[in-house]
Amino acid sequence: MLNLLPLLLQLAAAQPLPTLDEVQFEECLTLATKDPASAISSASLWAQQNGGHLARACHGFALATDFKFDLAVPILSEAAVLAEAKGDLRAARFWAQAGNAAIAAGQPDIAVDALTKSLASKSLENNERADSEVDRARALVALGKSSDGEAALATARQLAPENGAAWLLSATLARRLNKLPDALTYIQTSAALLPSDPAVALEAGNIAIAAGDDDTARKQWEQTIAIAPNSRQAVTATAQLAALAAASPAPTTEPQSR
Protein backbone atom coordinates (compact mmCIF):
# COMPACT_ATOMS: atom_id res chain seq x y z
CA MET A 1 0.00 0.00 0.00
CA LEU A 2 1.52 3.31 -1.15
CA ASN A 3 1.54 6.31 1.22
CA LEU A 4 -1.99 5.60 2.37
CA LEU A 5 -1.68 5.61 6.15
CA PRO A 6 0.30 8.85 6.77
CA LEU A 7 -1.85 10.98 4.49
CA LEU A 8 -5.26 9.78 5.60
CA LEU A 9 -4.40 10.07 9.27
CA GLN A 10 -3.88 13.80 8.67
CA LEU A 11 -7.43 14.23 7.48
CA ALA A 12 -9.12 14.22 10.87
CA ALA A 13 -7.01 17.18 11.98
CA ALA A 14 -7.68 19.33 8.92
CA GLN A 15 -10.75 21.12 10.32
CA PRO A 16 -10.36 23.75 13.08
CA LEU A 17 -13.54 22.96 15.04
CA PRO A 18 -14.09 19.28 15.76
CA THR A 19 -17.69 18.19 15.38
CA LEU A 20 -19.19 14.85 16.35
CA ASP A 21 -18.59 13.69 12.79
CA GLU A 22 -14.95 14.77 13.00
CA VAL A 23 -14.49 12.89 16.27
CA GLN A 24 -16.13 9.81 14.77
CA PHE A 25 -13.93 10.14 11.70
CA GLU A 26 -10.76 10.21 13.79
CA GLU A 27 -11.94 7.23 15.83
CA CYS A 28 -12.81 5.36 12.65
CA LEU A 29 -9.37 5.95 11.13
CA THR A 30 -7.68 4.83 14.31
CA LEU A 31 -9.78 1.66 14.39
CA ALA A 32 -8.92 0.98 10.75
CA THR A 33 -5.21 0.91 11.56
CA LYS A 34 -5.78 -1.69 14.28
CA ASP A 35 -8.77 -3.71 13.07
CA PRO A 36 -9.65 -2.89 9.47
CA ALA A 37 -12.42 -5.48 9.25
CA SER A 38 -14.27 -3.90 12.18
CA ALA A 39 -13.68 -0.43 10.75
CA ILE A 40 -15.14 -1.53 7.41
CA SER A 41 -18.34 -2.66 9.12
CA SER A 42 -18.51 0.43 11.32
CA ALA A 43 -17.87 2.89 8.48
CA SER A 44 -20.34 1.14 6.19
CA LEU A 45 -23.05 1.43 8.82
CA TRP A 46 -22.12 5.05 9.45
CA ALA A 47 -22.39 5.80 5.73
CA GLN A 48 -25.86 4.25 5.63
CA GLN A 49 -26.85 6.55 8.50
CA ASN A 50 -26.04 9.71 6.50
CA GLY A 51 -22.40 9.80 7.54
CA GLY A 52 -21.55 11.69 4.38
CA HIS A 53 -18.10 12.07 2.90
CA LEU A 54 -16.24 11.40 6.16
CA ALA A 55 -17.91 8.02 6.58
CA ARG A 56 -17.03 7.11 3.01
CA ALA A 57 -13.46 8.34 3.40
CA CYS A 58 -12.93 6.12 6.41
CA HIS A 59 -14.70 3.22 4.70
CA GLY A 60 -12.33 3.53 1.75
CA PHE A 61 -9.31 3.83 4.02
CA ALA A 62 -10.34 0.73 5.96
CA LEU A 63 -10.82 -1.24 2.75
CA ALA A 64 -7.41 -0.18 1.46
CA THR A 65 -5.81 -1.03 4.80
CA ASP A 66 -7.37 -4.48 4.41
CA PHE A 67 -5.81 -4.67 0.91
CA LYS A 68 -9.21 -4.49 -0.82
CA PHE A 69 -7.99 -1.78 -3.14
CA ASP A 70 -10.50 -2.40 -5.93
CA LEU A 71 -13.35 -1.81 -3.49
CA ALA A 72 -11.65 1.21 -1.93
CA VAL A 73 -11.27 3.14 -5.19
CA PRO A 74 -14.95 3.99 -5.90
CA ILE A 75 -15.68 4.73 -2.25
CA LEU A 76 -12.74 7.11 -1.88
CA SER A 77 -13.74 8.74 -5.17
CA GLU A 78 -17.28 9.19 -3.88
CA ALA A 79 -15.88 10.70 -0.68
CA ALA A 80 -13.93 13.19 -2.79
CA VAL A 81 -16.97 14.19 -4.86
CA LEU A 82 -19.11 14.66 -1.75
CA ALA A 83 -16.33 16.63 -0.04
CA GLU A 84 -16.10 18.96 -3.03
CA ALA A 85 -19.85 19.52 -2.85
CA LYS A 86 -19.45 20.47 0.81
CA GLY A 87 -16.52 22.77 0.11
CA ASP A 88 -14.25 20.57 2.21
CA LEU A 89 -10.66 21.12 1.07
CA ARG A 90 -9.80 17.56 2.05
CA ALA A 91 -11.37 16.52 -1.25
CA ALA A 92 -7.92 16.82 -2.83
CA ARG A 93 -6.53 14.32 -0.36
CA PHE A 94 -9.41 11.94 -0.92
CA TRP A 95 -8.72 12.10 -4.67
CA ALA A 96 -5.05 11.44 -3.98
CA GLN A 97 -5.88 8.37 -1.95
CA ALA A 98 -8.35 7.13 -4.55
CA GLY A 99 -5.52 7.37 -7.06
CA ASN A 100 -3.13 5.62 -4.71
CA ALA A 101 -5.57 2.76 -4.22
CA ALA A 102 -6.22 2.56 -7.96
CA ILE A 103 -2.52 2.00 -8.59
CA ALA A 104 -2.50 -0.83 -6.06
CA ALA A 105 -5.61 -2.25 -7.73
CA GLY A 106 -3.95 -2.26 -11.14
CA GLN A 107 -6.15 0.52 -12.53
CA PRO A 108 -3.63 3.10 -13.82
CA ASP A 109 -6.13 4.95 -16.02
CA ILE A 110 -8.44 5.57 -13.07
CA ALA A 111 -5.40 6.50 -10.97
CA VAL A 112 -4.28 9.19 -13.42
CA ASP A 113 -7.76 10.70 -13.49
CA ALA A 114 -8.06 10.79 -9.69
CA LEU A 115 -4.55 12.15 -9.17
CA THR A 116 -5.04 14.83 -11.81
CA LYS A 117 -8.14 15.99 -9.92
CA SER A 118 -6.16 16.00 -6.69
CA LEU A 119 -3.36 18.08 -8.18
CA ALA A 120 -5.83 20.57 -9.64
CA SER A 121 -6.54 21.71 -6.08
CA LYS A 122 -4.38 24.34 -4.39
CA SER A 123 -4.99 22.89 -0.93
CA LEU A 124 -2.20 20.29 -0.91
CA GLU A 125 1.13 21.00 0.74
CA ASN A 126 4.25 20.62 -1.39
CA ASN A 127 5.13 17.25 0.11
CA GLU A 128 1.60 16.00 -0.57
CA ARG A 129 1.74 17.29 -4.14
CA ALA A 130 5.07 15.54 -4.60
CA ASP A 131 3.60 12.25 -3.38
CA SER A 132 0.71 12.64 -5.80
CA GLU A 133 3.10 13.40 -8.66
CA VAL A 134 5.08 10.26 -7.80
CA ASP A 135 1.91 8.20 -7.85
CA ARG A 136 0.83 9.84 -11.10
CA ALA A 137 4.20 8.95 -12.60
CA ARG A 138 3.72 5.31 -11.61
CA ALA A 139 0.35 5.24 -13.31
CA LEU A 140 1.56 7.04 -16.43
CA VAL A 141 4.47 4.64 -16.87
CA ALA A 142 2.08 1.71 -16.44
CA LEU A 143 0.06 3.20 -19.31
CA GLY A 144 3.18 3.37 -21.49
CA LYS A 145 3.53 7.16 -21.15
CA SER A 146 7.16 7.27 -20.03
CA SER A 147 7.80 10.87 -21.10
CA ASP A 148 4.83 12.09 -19.08
CA GLY A 149 6.06 9.97 -16.18
CA GLU A 150 9.48 11.61 -16.38
CA ALA A 151 7.86 15.05 -16.27
CA ALA A 152 5.76 14.12 -13.23
CA LEU A 153 8.84 12.84 -11.40
CA ALA A 154 10.78 16.00 -12.25
CA THR A 155 7.97 18.03 -10.71
CA ALA A 156 7.98 15.81 -7.62
CA ARG A 157 11.74 16.26 -7.16
CA GLN A 158 11.35 20.03 -7.46
CA LEU A 159 8.45 20.17 -5.01
CA ALA A 160 10.11 17.96 -2.39
CA PRO A 161 13.85 17.40 -2.93
CA GLU A 162 13.85 15.30 0.25
CA ASN A 163 11.41 12.78 -1.24
CA GLY A 164 13.56 9.68 -1.60
CA ALA A 165 10.88 7.76 -3.47
CA ALA A 166 10.83 10.38 -6.22
CA TRP A 167 14.57 9.98 -6.76
CA LEU A 168 14.36 6.19 -6.62
CA LEU A 169 11.58 5.98 -9.19
CA SER A 170 13.42 8.52 -11.34
CA ALA A 171 16.46 6.23 -11.26
CA THR A 172 14.41 3.18 -12.19
CA LEU A 173 12.71 4.92 -15.08
CA ALA A 174 15.97 6.41 -16.36
CA ARG A 175 17.58 2.96 -16.34
CA ARG A 176 14.67 1.48 -18.27
CA LEU A 177 15.02 4.27 -20.82
CA ASN A 178 18.77 3.56 -21.02
CA LYS A 179 19.64 6.98 -19.58
CA LEU A 180 22.32 5.51 -17.33
CA PRO A 181 24.15 8.74 -16.32
CA ASP A 182 20.84 10.19 -15.12
CA ALA A 183 19.97 6.92 -13.40
CA LEU A 184 23.27 6.95 -11.52
CA THR A 185 22.76 10.55 -10.36
CA TYR A 186 19.22 9.83 -9.18
CA ILE A 187 20.11 6.63 -7.32
CA GLN A 188 23.01 8.33 -5.53
CA THR A 189 20.64 11.01 -4.24
CA SER A 190 18.08 8.40 -3.26
CA ALA A 191 20.72 6.39 -1.39
CA ALA A 192 21.69 9.47 0.61
CA LEU A 193 18.04 10.04 1.55
CA LEU A 194 17.13 6.37 2.12
CA PRO A 195 20.35 4.64 3.20
CA SER A 196 18.57 1.63 4.72
CA ASP A 197 16.00 1.01 2.00
CA PRO A 198 16.50 -2.36 0.28
CA ALA A 199 14.72 -1.10 -2.83
CA VAL A 200 17.42 1.55 -3.26
CA ALA A 201 20.25 -0.97 -2.95
CA LEU A 202 18.48 -3.31 -5.36
CA GLU A 203 18.06 -0.58 -7.96
CA ALA A 204 21.67 0.53 -7.50
CA GLY A 205 22.68 -3.00 -8.41
CA ASN A 206 20.38 -3.00 -11.41
CA ILE A 207 21.90 0.24 -12.67
CA ALA A 208 25.42 -1.08 -12.13
CA ILE A 209 24.75 -4.27 -14.09
CA ALA A 210 23.20 -2.24 -16.90
CA ALA A 211 26.41 -0.20 -17.01
CA GLY A 212 28.53 -3.36 -17.15
CA ASP A 213 29.88 -3.01 -13.60
CA ASP A 214 29.42 -6.54 -12.29
CA ASP A 215 31.42 -6.01 -9.09
CA THR A 216 29.34 -3.03 -7.96
CA ALA A 217 26.14 -4.84 -8.89
CA ARG A 218 27.18 -7.82 -6.78
CA LYS A 219 28.00 -5.61 -3.79
CA GLN A 220 24.70 -3.73 -4.03
CA TRP A 221 22.63 -6.90 -4.27
CA GLU A 222 24.51 -8.42 -1.33
CA GLN A 223 23.76 -5.22 0.59
CA THR A 224 20.07 -5.57 -0.32
CA ILE A 225 19.99 -8.98 1.33
CA ALA A 226 21.92 -7.72 4.36
CA ILE A 227 19.55 -4.78 4.87
CA ALA A 228 16.32 -6.80 4.72
CA PRO A 229 16.92 -10.55 4.33
CA ASN A 230 13.22 -11.44 4.39
CA SER A 231 12.06 -8.77 1.96
CA ARG A 232 10.84 -9.26 -1.59
CA GLN A 233 13.80 -7.14 -2.67
CA ALA A 234 16.11 -9.70 -1.07
CA VAL A 235 14.41 -12.48 -3.04
CA THR A 236 15.00 -10.55 -6.26
CA ALA A 237 18.59 -9.77 -5.30
CA THR A 238 19.27 -13.44 -4.57
CA ALA A 239 17.99 -14.39 -8.01
CA GLN A 240 20.07 -11.65 -9.62
CA LEU A 241 23.20 -12.83 -7.83
CA ALA A 242 22.57 -16.40 -8.98
CA ALA A 243 22.15 -15.24 -12.57
CA LEU A 244 25.32 -13.18 -12.33
CA ALA A 245 27.27 -16.14 -10.96
CA ALA A 246 25.95 -18.39 -13.73
CA ALA A 247 26.97 -15.88 -16.38
CA SER A 248 30.46 -15.37 -14.98
CA PRO A 249 33.23 -17.49 -16.51
CA ALA A 250 34.50 -20.26 -14.29
CA PRO A 251 37.95 -19.58 -12.83
CA THR A 252 40.74 -21.34 -14.67
CA THR A 253 43.38 -23.34 -12.85
CA GLU A 254 46.97 -23.54 -13.93
CA PRO A 255 48.12 -27.09 -14.74
CA GLN A 256 50.52 -28.40 -12.14
CA SER A 257 54.06 -29.04 -13.34
CA ARG A 258 55.59 -32.42 -12.65
Where are these regions (language model features)?
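Helix-start (N-cap) detector for alpha-helical repeat units in TPR-like alpha-solenoids
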Residues: 21, 53-54, 87, 92, ...
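Canonical tetratricopeptide repeat
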Residues: 58, 97, 131, 135, ...
